Amino acid sequence: MSKDEELLQNYCSILFTYKTIGISNLHLYYFRETEIKSLKQLINAEFAILQTCNRVEIYLYSDTNTLKEVNKIIQYLNNIHNEPIGNQARVLCGKDAAKHLFLVASGADSLSIGEYEILSQIRSTIDMFKKLGFSGKYLQIFFERAIKVGRKVREETSISKGKVGIYSLAIDEAKKRFNDFYDRRILVIGAGEMAQKITSMLHNEGAKDVTIMNRTIEKAKQLALKFGYNYEKLDLDKLGNFDVAFISIYHENLRLENKWNTLIVDITVPPLFTGNNVITLEELERISNLNFKAREEELAKINKLVEDGINELLYDYKKEIYTEFMSKIMKRIETIRENEILRAYKELEKLGINDQQAKEILDLMTRSIIKKSFQPLFDNIRSLIFNGENSINYINFLIDIFKDGNISGFETEKIKEKQVSERSSI
């Protein structure tokens, strides 16, 4: 591991995904709002939780000991689930954590390869956790870089060409059975985000005879009227009246048999329906992977863009460290300057000099002295941060000199020992 890569070790992730625990089990790992708030009280770290139908991923940043905070979360999960659920987590830190999130943002790790939806999900996640006060500037730059990498991958590769989103795949698989939707009776069960997207796509496909069913009739009505469709109260016994039904509704682990001739496209997690003539998310995943095999040559390009993104993240991180360092030092210098100017004003007043112009000259002169005196030092510090082999150790050592506290969990002992050793050998 290079010294630069060590800088990223303050970032870690705890992962539960459709690849590791299966799409049908993923709902067991979702965090409730109360559990998220409990984490805030438990750990000493910035954190954000990315929860989608494909994954539950916790990202952390701590400037002390991130792995210690990871272990706290895993123990917490074990306690609330009354079983060692944390043992099923995949834990990544440093460059590996960044690479994973960047691949997720690129759509290369999605159930539906190349999907665009994940970018908005990453954006809404970091925005929400920032608003809640659970994430800070270091996790912000981590997620912002992931979003930039995701956009760049889509611009420079063909990973997202064609219909790759999970909703598009669901529509296409249903169309294969009927050629088109023009004269088909279609049912959408649910009125949430997924159902809204399915309904919008059906409208774009020219579907005319569509009915929205939902437990809350008002939500079904609101969605249906938006597209000029019908709506009804949820009644599963009526499924046999339709040619195709798209299912997107929350349920408490129900499993129902498809006893009708209706084609059921069930994108619920876990699936509500089993049996013949049922298409689930797992089936759509298989189709997505087959589609991606035709674009496997894009993987090398994607991996290169991800590696470039990690180097850019390192730059972002160092820039944030430098900005924080400069802010701390300049705040201290400015406090000293202002105090000394006040002393000088008082001395001038003792001499009978109470000229406002003289005070302004004194203010400008001290600012100029500080700028000319410290600029070479600041230039050297910037060079150490962005180019130095032991950049983070030098930063902490300089801050120790100014007695202003550390901004990183990396110890300064190594650099101090090195300096002592060098003096001893003279």
Swiss-Prot record:
Keyword Oxidoreductase applies: yes
Q: A single GO molecular function, which one? A: NADP binding
Name of this chain's protein: Glutamyl-tRNA reductase
Quaternary context: Homodimer.
Q: Where is this site: Important for activity?
A: 100
Q: Note whether Oxidoreductase occurs among the keywords.
A: yes
Q: Which organism is it from?
A: Saccharolobus solfataricus (strain ATCC 35092 / DSM 1617 / JCM 11322 / P2)
- Write down the PROSITE patterns for this protein, in alphabetical order: GLUTR
As recorded in UniProt, coiled-coil segments are none
Query: What family is it from?
Result: Belongs to the glutamyl-tRNA reductase family.
Q: What else is on record for this protein?
A: During catalysis, the active site Cys acts as a nucleophile attacking the alpha-carbonyl group of tRNA-bound glutamate with the formation of a thioester intermediate between enzyme and glutamate, and the concomitant release of tRNA(Glu). The thioester intermediate is finally reduced by direct hydride transfer from NADPH, to form the product GSA.
Q: Provide the residue positions that the database annotates as binding substrate.
A: 52-55, 110, 115-117, 121
Q: In which pathway does it act?
A: Porphyrin-containing compound metabolism; protoporphyrin-IX biosynthesis; 5-aminolevulinate from L-glutamyl-tRNA(Glu): step 1/2
The record's domain comment reads: Possesses an unusual extended V-shaped dimeric structure with each monomer consisting of three distinct domains arranged along a curved 'spinal' alpha-helix. The N-terminal catalytic domain specifically recognizes the glutamate moiety of the substrate. The second domain is the NADPH-binding domain, and the third C-terminal domain is responsible for dimerization.
Keyword field? NADP, Oxidoreductase, Porphyrin biosynthesis
Q: Which cysteines are joined by disulfide bonds?
A: none
